[in-house]
Amino acid sequence: MKKKIGLLVMAYGTPYKEEDIERYYTHIRRGRKPSPEMLEDLTERYRAIGGISPLATITLEQAKKLEKRLNEVQDEVEYHMYLGLKHIEPFIEDAVKEMHNDGIQDAIALVLAPHYSTFSVKSYVGRAQEEAEKLGNLTIHGIDSWYKEPKFIQYWVDAVKGIYSGMSDAEREKAVLIVSAHSLPEKIIAMGDPYPDQLNETADYIARGAEVANYAVGWQSAGNTPDPWIGPDVQDLTRELNEKYGYTSFVYAPVGFVAEHLEVLYDNDFECKVVTDEIGAKYYRPEMPNASDAFIDCLTDVVVKKKESVM
């Protein structure tokens, strides 16, 4: 009989329906309810992208396809997928409990975020491992980052090339690529968090692969807290690049995200587009990886490499 291996796929989570927004936001705020104004603001953002984010559906599809692919590409072990979310059910701890109940003793934990940070990957994997230790007889092997994975870089190289190939030579000369990820509080830099460096590296790899000379790194979707967050914000960066260099076409690659969701559909497709419209520039944003075969192949390689290194 083949050994069963747990595949713990972890992600941020998103409200499933409008009624979930308040409890979801309260969980993000560590139990503090949002003010009516804050709740209204977030609800309006969801309404602007069609009422609710497609993220829940995409995350589940990514996880199921990954499980299927892993069981197709090898015959030594049988992967069983469990989904664990940070801010809404099924919570990470629930997924680990279910895994334990199913008699799983070894699991590979993959966070659907390519870059490592203490705020994201470390906290997800930490929660999973803590729960596994409490339950006993279950080892969780966490994957730190996978932004250097050749198929991940290639996905974005192809996506960016696809946009540039549709431009005339004249437009291409005045175009700039903005590579971005979710901003985090600036204090992580003082703590030696590798997150900003990893995004810079990712941008270099993609620009080199897509043969794009004009590119910059930006940050987006900063939280509403008194702490300073890493910048420049993509909207400010857009204005600055237009003023300084006269760019008139902006290509946004939000590579810190793996799916279409609020941060991309609103913060990029709405907020950044407001800026490009204002300055009379063109707005482009490649398709997100979502559950595309190319992206699932990339994640398959990531999991297989981890499994081979620890088992």
Swiss-Prot record:
Binding site for Fe-coproporphyrin III: Y12, R29, R45, Y46, S53, Y124
GO molecular function terms listed in the Swiss-Prot or TrEMBL record: ferrochelatase activity; metal ion binding
InterPro entries: Ferrochelatase (IPR001015), Ferrochelatase_AS (IPR019772), Ferrochelatase_C (IPR033644), Ferrochelatase_N (IPR033659)
Any one biological process term the GO annotation gives: heme biosynthetic process
Binding site for Fe(2+): H182, E263
Iron among keywords: yes
Catalytic activities: Fe-coproporphyrin III + 2 H(+) = coproporphyrin III + Fe(2+)
Family: Belongs to the ferrochelatase family.
Function: Involved in coproporphyrin-dependent heme b biosynthesis. Catalyzes the insertion of ferrous iron into coproporphyrin III to form Fe-coproporphyrin III.
Protein name as it appears in the record: Coproporphyrin III ferrochelatase 1
Organism annotation: Bacillus thuringiensis subsp. konkukian (strain 97-27)
Primary gene name: cpfC1
